[in-house]
Amino acid sequence: MSIRNLFSWLLIVATITLSARAFAEGEWVVEKTFHVGGEGGFDYITVDAKSHRLYVPRSTHTMVIDAESGETVADINGQEHNHGVAVVPELARGFISDGAGSIVMFDLKTNAVLGTVVAKDDADGIVYDKSTGLVLVACGDAGVLITLKADADPKTAVIDTPIELGGKPEFLAVDGAGKVYVNLEDKDQVAVVDLKTRKVLAHWPVAPGGSPVGLSIDTEKHRLFIGCRKPQKMLVMSTDDGKVVGDLPIAVGVDATRWDGHQAFASTREGKLSVAEEKGGKWETVQTVTTGLGTKTMDIDNAAHKIYLPTAEFEEAKPGARPVAKQGTFMIVVVGRR
């Protein structure tokens, strides 16, 4: 390579690096709001970045929404009290957790229901672990983690033997290497589960936090991001030994955390999205985005740099009570980088 070509190549690399760094340091802003409407409550939202679809459980049905236009693509009926959705693009399948004690399997292309599998009480947080080919569901009232083979025959599928967790699970995160971490809300702990041996390896306390609910993971740097309600914190925990290495204050009513490869996020019912990152070995909040009352859950499309937060308009709250959502006002707030 000539000196001139080498210089040109180095200049291109430097430009790309600086551009990426500048983008990573950009501010997050509310870009738009999809006014979706429809009936029912809302819980965990799931983004399928490959198809640009949003999956939104609405109590008795699950809405499929175009992530770019906000238009409703389909509506999957037949649930009683749904909570979350896991998608498996390589199998063209989706899975809905139903708190009434079931997992609904559906086709990602047609959105048709393929089958319903008996689960355990209060089937709640749900994720897919590609390393094992398992769909994992935290069942709160039952106090167990259940697993289901993602490629199981929808007509004959049954769950594997449940794994007793020693507490009430809320959400979970997989490391892609055979382990899953599960928040135990009532025990102020994170349970570490080996999916190969199907045993709980450890219970890690979340002090100085408590009532852990939201959970996400940085598999490269071995970090968990734990959203706690009592007290209100986002904790950063090492997956090597359970040591808390970051302690960040957040707003009221957290229900989800996410990681984008550079920053960690915590969404809250109060309508404040906390953005945190590690600087000089110390975790700090670098931005707080006002997203609106009720935006307690979220999902992120890391490729598009978009965060989607479901909420609604609310009636004025009575003293000592939570505000009630107005019928037909469901919407999705879209946050992106500026």
Please annotate each region the language model reported:
Residues M1-N5:
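N-terminal secretory signal peptides that target proteins for export/translocation
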Residues R21-R338:
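Predominantly soluble domains enriched in secretory-pathway, periplasmic, or organellar proteins
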Residues S8-L18:
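Bacterial N-terminal signal peptides
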